């Protein structure tokens, strides 16, 4: 139940309907305990983690928002106002780069769910969508798994808000004849610096009295490929965001205060079918190969390397300032 599913359910419930929401992960409170356990022990729950659970991947990310000032329909403003009504800082309504923070976002997500339930909707956590039930060329229900049991639910309309990590769902949908096509995506590394360094670089001596500084970088390589920074997290941390056993993914997050010692940002490049193959799931398999290599390189932990060593393709023997 990421942002797409959450707001679809909210709009339907506000319109007087009673949607039934299936979320493969746990509610935000149980999910937080499971994620903390994973970070402390390395024991991954593939059904409830940084990717799956109430709020989606964003619950354990930075809580950054887009302003979409050119949004002609006003939908984005409505979303921001909804966040504020459910406990987000009012400043997100006017800040150039609005930010809720991981700590506050959990409370906001819980509050939105409570409104959805109060309007008559039903939410089933720890419940995995398995496949569509079809009668001819029409949907007549869904099959789902809950507590190890397969059940069915009749319905005439389904909104599949899968996010990007439910790979088993994509495979099942293909087998059922759902039309899909591969698309480009970004892949890269997380760069980490002392926040004080970024502040001095951006603000000089004024960094002492200004909010934590961020940065945005772009570059076009000699072969025309774009490289850019993404999801810069001032005063944040790099976290293990894996959702499949034996594979490793990282993400960055900041809490509302952004008062951590380090800053981090993704440095990514866009890749497409010309890089990983034209097959429908070639991009997905490309991701899995990278994730497995990262897992093996770090023996299940996040592999860390100095930037200079990374650029020279050599192993790091010591850490830097972070």
Predicted regions and their residues:
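Residues forming the flavin
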Residues: 1-322
């Amino acid at each position: 139940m990421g942002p797409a599913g959450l707001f679809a359910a909210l709009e339907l419930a506000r319109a007087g309907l009673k949607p039934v929401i299936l979320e493969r992960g746990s509610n935000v409170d149980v999910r937080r305990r499971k994620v903390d356990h994973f970070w402390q022990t390395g024991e991954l729950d593939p059904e409830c983690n940084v990717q799956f659970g109430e709020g989606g991947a964003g619950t354990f990310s930075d809580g950054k928002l887009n302003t979409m000032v050119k949004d002609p329909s006003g939908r984005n403003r409505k979303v921001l106002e909804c966040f504020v009504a459910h406990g987000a800082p009012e400043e997100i309504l006017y800040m150039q780069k609005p930010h809720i923070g991981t700590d506050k976002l959990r409370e906001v997500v819980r509050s939105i769910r409570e409104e959805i339930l109060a309007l008559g909707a039903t939410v089933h956590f720890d419940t995995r969508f398995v496949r569509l039930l079809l009668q001819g060329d029409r949907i007549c229900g869904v099959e789902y798994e809950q507590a190890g049991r397969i059940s069915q639910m009749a319905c005439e309309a389904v909104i599949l808000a899968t996010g990007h990590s439910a790979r088993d769902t994509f495979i099942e949908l293909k087998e059922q004849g759902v039309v899909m096509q591969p698309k480009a995506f970004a892949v890269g590394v997380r760069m980490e610096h002392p926040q004080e360094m970024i502040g001095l670089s951006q603000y000089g001596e004024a960094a002492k009295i200004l909010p934590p500084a961020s940065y945005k970088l772009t570059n076009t390589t000699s072969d025309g490929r774009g490289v850019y920074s993404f999801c810069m997290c001032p005063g944040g941390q790099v976290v293990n965001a894996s959702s499949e056993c034996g594979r490793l993914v990282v993400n960055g997050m900041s809490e509302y205060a952004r008062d951590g010692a380090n800053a981090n940002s993704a440095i990514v490049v866009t890749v497409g079918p010309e890089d990983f193959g034209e097959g429908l799931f070639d991009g997905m398999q490309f991701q899995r190969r990278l994730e497995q290599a990262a897992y093996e390189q770090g023996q299940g932990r996040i592999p860390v390397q100095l930037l200079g060593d990374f650029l020279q393709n050599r192993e790091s023997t010591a850490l830097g300032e972070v």
